[in-house]
């Protein structure tokens, strides 16, 4: 005998929001200088995804365990993009759809190397899910391991400001990707971000950190609401 669930219970925006999941994706194995942990991207994305789930009632699906990266960016351990999609992302979404009866999902990306946006249409068709790719964290946090990311980490309690004086590219070339010559030569946007970090340095700011996190959470909430409209039309 099936138990009837109280879908209208709790502080949720709609009982239909249970049909929407939120999955975080980020890198767990990537250098971020001495003041941030190697899984900074995954932790920031997980916070944003969970906070949006708490505020809307959407299902929190956790965090993907792997990430992809451009071949010329060498600051961590990553996997091929197609392998990431086929072996990691698809199985997680397929299982969530089956076990939780999902109809839609927001994927919250916290890692610039996860260039998966152009895979979403194929994923939607194959999995039978409406999918929103949310890249807001990457869009607004600025250079890799720079002021924005460090400031967000400060708010989350994962930054060690005792090591701030060590945050120089001569010791940690991944900061701003300043010392990653191959990446800067291959990618104009990476070089632009590195120049910003060279000019401005790394300066933690709790106001900036909170603004980045709040902006990212609101962006995911907006995606949840848009997906809710779509699934309610069916």
UniProtKB/Swiss-Prot annotation:
Fe cation 2 binds at residues 32, 41. The keyword Metal-binding applies. Requires one Fe(2+) ion for activity. SUPFAM superfamilies: Creatininase. It is an enzyme of class 3 (hydrolase). It catalyses: 2-amino-5-formylamino-6-(5-phospho-D-ribosylamino)pyrimidin-4(3H)-one + H2O = 2,5-diamino-6-(1-D-ribosylamino)pyrimidin-4(3H)-one 5'-phosphate + formate + H(+). GO terms for molecular function: 2-amino-5-formylamino-6-(5-phosphoribosylamino)pyrimidin-4(3H)-one formate-lyase activity; ferrous iron binding. Belongs to the creatininase superfamily. FAPy deformylase family. This is 2-amino-5-formylamino-6-ribosylaminopyrimidin-4(3H)-one 5'-monophosphate deformylase.
